[in-house]
């Protein structure tokens, strides 16, 4: 039976329906907004035992079918392949608000498949993916404490826009995806153009109002088609095991919790875990993993209690303190820009590389094919946390962290017209104990300034945490990895001294009240200013020039109608320039030209060459030209590529000239002055006036018409008159 609900959201109709598609799944919902349609199906191992993993084994796969935009996939096989970066980020966006809404003891394998089935090329699918996945879980029998709503918030011309279109986002001052329950925000992610804290919080308030409507719509669908929820009865641990582990571990856990550095602490925890598991092996075989979970709970309880009781964290800091910071730039001699940013036991080596137009990344999406001239790649090798990890390409986490840092930095980059370089920033995390993505933001800002990229202002980032018990709470600044793990919130906030450029928040509790968020944002701002002070103490502004090893790029415009003349038949002209100068030349349809190369003199030569090909003759200007043809009445001289003018025999010399060949020959290079461009565009030149700047144009008797066979490129020229 088909069940359907609908409402107005942001001036467009939002509809949800179930009962027609994928009826054998645990829950399936189709969401339509405009002409964009997303379908999500959720399923779980209903009859299998809970997973033995120490985490909730939920996977989300968001895919944008190319047929949704009326396209056929490229490549040899002509079918969808590995998920694109946008799809991976969409999968993470769906996963993050849903994961904390399941009970800890529910560990059955759960899968969410979301598909973009139709795209109107204006409304993006990720938001609908969150809605449809949430609705699918809400109508299923699974113990999901949702539903959740999701909206995108923009700000254009002083007004907030709910679910701005792709076109509107191009001029929007912010782009935030916000998810939550009726009265609490659970997840947010996005970017902004240095907005104030007040504007950010207003956006969250508006988002909350719209989220409530979306949640109520899903609740209406649940009333029509929802199944009764089952109660999770499985225990996490065998009877008596938790008490036995606590008895053996509790005396030492308090000591371990304040042990540093991280590696020493981790080794001590592992040794204790193995020892206790060995002691309990007779009664509880293969129990080491569960022993680790119980010890984890003990350390979490101790960490939180100490913060509430003493306002002291495991590393001795107060809740509002940031860790010691050290940063340096220019440490890699042949790179274009480099920085090492160290905050506590988190360390990022960040390198900026400048490239040319040909280095831009082509992004083939459902909406359109686009090009990216700024890329930030984040790498998290195993050794950064003392582990062994295979190299299989970037993980979803690495892609997500890189995207957050990229969005945060992108807001301060110069426009292409002012700095026509392709920029790639790579952040290699060398050590990690919390907030490596924000260390990447700080390091990227420093590396870009070291590379001479004229960014508007430095950007810094900090991760905020939270511990909350009932009405009691404590906000933590610059959290450690353990505080992220044991705490209730991970709020990453990046920005300049002016305002916020990037934000991401994930909660492990049911939601976050507006008052708490406002306080966390203010604390993050204070920390960000302190970090910027430290960064600017090392390098306060971009270097005056780019690295000597970076390519030189000159950008200028030529008339669109001259593009063909520059390229030449079959690319003949442009190839000649490339071969002679060793440069790269990119010409866009709008007439913009990018000339790049590693040898400045060759770049200048190529620029002058191209400009000369489109230059028009100018009366009064002296040119260095080549004699191309000789007639009985004068000589034709090429003063610009493809542009000839006539030096009449009377203008070859102050003396009387009997034969043109007595003064010039074909192939001679001579200086000539442009004296006239007639109504037909023909150029008249004078060698005599170029040789003698004081010479005046003299009157000559009228001359006879030239023979038609000796004319110009049109095989003839009307009579020359003085």
Where are the regions that the model predicts?
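Flexible, glycine/charged-enriched surface loops at secondary-structure junctions
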Residues: 104-110, 145-147, 214-232, 264, ...
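Glycine-rich, flexible beta-strand/loop modules in the N-terminal catalytic cores of phosphate-handling
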Residues: 25-111, 116-123, 182, 189, ...
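Conserved phosphate/anionic-ligand binding catalytic regions in large, soluble enzymes, centered on
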Residues: 27-29, 123-141, 329-352, 433-453, ...
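Single-stranded RNA-binding regions, centering on S1/OB-family and related RNA-binding modules
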Residues: 549-553, 560-722
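Flexible glycine-/small-residue-rich
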Residues: 33, 42-44, 62-64, 114-118, ...
């Amino acid at each position: 039976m088909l069940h359907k609900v609908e409402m107005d959201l942001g001036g467009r109709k939002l509809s949800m329906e179930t009962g027609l598609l994928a009826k054998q799944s645990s829950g399936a919902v189709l969401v339509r907004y405009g002409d964009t349609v997303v379908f999500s199906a959720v399923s779980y191992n209903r009859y299998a035992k809970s997973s033995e993993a120490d985490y909730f084994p939920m996977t989300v796969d968001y895919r944008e079918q190319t047929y949704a935009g009326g396209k056929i996939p490229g490549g040899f096989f002509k079918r969808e392949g590995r998920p694109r970066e946008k799809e991976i980020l969409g999968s993470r966006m769906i996963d993050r608000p849903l994961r904390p809404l399941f009970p800890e003891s529910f560990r059955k394998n759960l899968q969410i498949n979301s598909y973009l089935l139709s795209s109107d090329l204006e409304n993006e699918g990720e938001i609908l993916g969150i809605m449809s996945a949430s609705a699918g879980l809400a109508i299923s029998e699974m113990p999901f404490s949702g539903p959740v709503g999701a909206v995108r918030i923009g700000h254009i011309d002083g007004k907030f826009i709910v679910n701005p279109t792709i076109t509107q986002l191009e001029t929007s001052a912010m782009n935030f995806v916000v998810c939550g329950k009726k009265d609490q925000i659970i997840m947010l992610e996005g970017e902004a153009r240095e907005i104030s804290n007040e504007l950010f919080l207003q956006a969250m308030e508006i988002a909350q109002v719209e989220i409530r409507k979306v949640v109520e719509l899903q609740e209406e669908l649940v009333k029509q088609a929802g199944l009764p929820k089952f109660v999770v009865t499985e225990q996490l641990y065998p009877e008596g095991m938790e008490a036995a582990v606590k008895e053996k571990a509790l005396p030492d856990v308090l000591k371990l919790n304040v042990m540093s550095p991280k590696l020493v602490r981790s080794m001590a925890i592992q040794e204790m875990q193995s020892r206790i598991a060995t002691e309990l092996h007779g009664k509880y075989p293969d129990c080491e993993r569960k022993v680790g979970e119980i010890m984890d709970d003990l350390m979490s309880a101790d960490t939180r209690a100490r913060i509430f009781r003493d306002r002291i964290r495991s590393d001795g800091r107060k809740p509002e303190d940031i860790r010691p910071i050290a940063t340096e730039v220019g440490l890699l001699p042949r790179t274009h820009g480099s920085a090492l940013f160290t905050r506590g036991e988190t360390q990022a080596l960040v390198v900026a590389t400048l490239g040319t137009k040909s280095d831009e990344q082509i992004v083939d999406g459902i909406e359109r094919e686009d090009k990216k001239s700024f890329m930030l790649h984040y790498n998290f090798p195993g050794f950064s946390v003392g582990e062994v990890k295979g190299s299989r390409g970037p993980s979803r986490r690495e892609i997500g962290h890189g995207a957050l840092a990229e969005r945060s930095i992108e807001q301060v980059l110069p426009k292409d017209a002012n700095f026509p370089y392709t920029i790639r920033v790579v952040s290699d995390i060398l050590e990690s104990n919390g907030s490596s993505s924000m260390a990447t933001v700080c390091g990227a800002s420093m590396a870009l300034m070291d590379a001479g990229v004229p960014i508007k202002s430095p950007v810094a980032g900090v991760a905020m945490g939270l511990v909350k018990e009932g009405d009691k709470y404590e906000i933590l600044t610059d959290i450690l990895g353990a505080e992220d793990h044991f705490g209730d919130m991970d709020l990453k906030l990046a920005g300049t001294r002016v305002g916020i450029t990037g934000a991401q928040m994930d909660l492990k509790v049911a939601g976050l009240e507006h008052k708490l968020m406002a306080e966390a944002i203010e604390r993050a701002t204070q920390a960000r200013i302190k970090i910027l002070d430290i960064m600017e103490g090392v390098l306060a502004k971009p270097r005056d020039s780019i690295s000597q090893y970076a390519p030189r790029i000159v950008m200028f415009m030529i008339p669109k109608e001259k593009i063909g003349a520059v390229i030449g038949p079959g690319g003949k002209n442009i190839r000649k320039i490339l071969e002679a100068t060793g440069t790269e030349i990119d010409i866009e349809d709008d007439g913009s030209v990018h000339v790049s190369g590693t040898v400045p003199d060759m770049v200048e030569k190529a620029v002058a060459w191209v400009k000369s090909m489109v230059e028009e003759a100018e009366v009064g200007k002296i040119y260095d030209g080549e004699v191309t043809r000789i007639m009985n009445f004068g000589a034709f001289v090429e003063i610009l590529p493809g542009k000839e003018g006539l030096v009449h025999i009377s203008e070859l010399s102050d003396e009387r000239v009997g034969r043109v060949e007595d003064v010039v020959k074909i192939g001679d290079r001579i200086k000539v002055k442009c004296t006239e461009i007639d109504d037909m565009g023909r150029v008249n030149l004078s060698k005599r006036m170029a040789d003698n700047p004081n010479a005046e144009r003299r009157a000559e008797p009228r001359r006879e018409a030239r023979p038609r066979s000796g004319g110009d490129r049109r095989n003839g020229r009307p009579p020359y008159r003085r």
